[in-house]
Amino acid sequence: MMHTVISAVANIWTAPDSPRPSDQFMLQPTVMIRDWLERMTYDERLGLCTDNVIQTQVLFGEKVLVTAEQGEWVSVIVPSQPSRKDPRGYPGWMKKYQLEKTKPIHTQHDVMISKPAAFLYRSNGEKEIELSFLTVLPLIAKENGYFKVSTVFGERFVRQSDAVPVSQQKGTAEDIIQTGAFFLGLPYLWGGISGFGFDCSGFMYSIFKANGYSIPRDAGDQAKAGKGVPLDDMKAGDLLFFAYEEGKGAIHHVGLYVGGGKMLHSPKTGKSIEILTLTETIYEKELCAVRRCFSE
């Protein structure tokens, strides 16, 4: 059965016993993602990956398929995040109370949060929850500098300066690059797929999705998306893939080519989103594939 995410950003955990004491901020219906990120040590951030703690994240209003229940936990599939792990979408576990059974909300238009984060407001002007970039909300009307939107909580508001109407037109390579550049300096987060932090493939997935493209969630799957491009014929907007053993092993990283021999990417734990010159870096040796996923 399909359920709707009611937390601003919910972690998709590897298993019900995956969360650590430091992860309690993300186990409540109203998650405290800023507190979680600010209090995690470097080792705890690294452990999200090395200890296989989380798989990905989902945003407020997204639909997930519940496949099983185990106490306070539910096994879910995220249809909006294509993955080789399951043909239906990305699998993992969530806290049951971060979801709600809802009927589909149908309006003629949607708006998308375009800032890294933005508040959802009640009609009296009180802030309700802080939403992430890429959160999509059904639009009801425009009122006094706000978008009135439909949510699982009822009618709410977001500032027009914090969101944009969802366009049916796909963005250009330059649009994708500009979307990504907006996040320069944002610290890397393993499993991250929100304006509070991205991993390498979550960053690519998100900036392409913001421009109307659906690509898989993980780098290994993204390396099969779009069309292949010779390594010496890359264009700005292409996805660059990197593999161990100087490009001959397993793919472990993805970035966005921005032209001029430079790449925009979310590097690794302890680093932040940056534009990097590829020459004389480990990435120059590890480059193994180029894929074009935008419309030319």
Swiss-Prot record:
Q: What induces it?
A: Repressed by AbrB, a transcription factor that negatively controls biofilm formation.
Pathway(s) of this molecule: Cell wall degradation; peptidoglycan degradation
Which residues belong to any copy of the NlpC/P60 domain? 170-295
State the active site: 200, 253, 265
Q: Which UniProt keywords apply?
A: Cell wall biogenesis/degradation, Hydrolase, Protease, Thiol protease
Is the Protease keyword given for this protein?
Answer: yes
Highest taxon above the source species? Bacteria
Q: Where does substrate bind?
A: 90, 199-201, 218-219
**EC number(s) per entry:** 3.4.14.13
Q: Keyword Hydrolase: yes or no?
A: yes
Query: What reaction does this catalyse?
Result: The enzyme releases L-Ala-gamma-D-Glu dipeptides from cell wall peptides via cleavage of an L-Ala-gamma-D-Glu-|-L-Lys bond
Name any Gene Ontology BP term.
cell wall organization
Give the molecular function GO annotations: cysteine-type peptidase activity; endopeptidase activity
Q: What does this protein do?
A: Specifically hydrolyzes gamma-D-glutamyl-L-lysine bonds in murein peptides, releasing L-Ala-D-Glu.
Please report which protein family the annotation says this sequence is part of: Belongs to the peptidase C40 family.
Query: Which PANTHER family has this protein been placed in?
Result: GAMMA-D-GLUTAMYL-L-LYSINE DIPEPTIDYL-PEPTIDASE, MUREIN DD-ENDOPEPTIDASE MEPH-RELATED
The protein, known as? Gamma-D-glutamyl-L-lysine dipeptidyl-peptidase
Q: Which organism is it from?
A: Bacillus subtilis (strain 168)
Q: Which gene specifies this protein's sequence?
A: ykfC
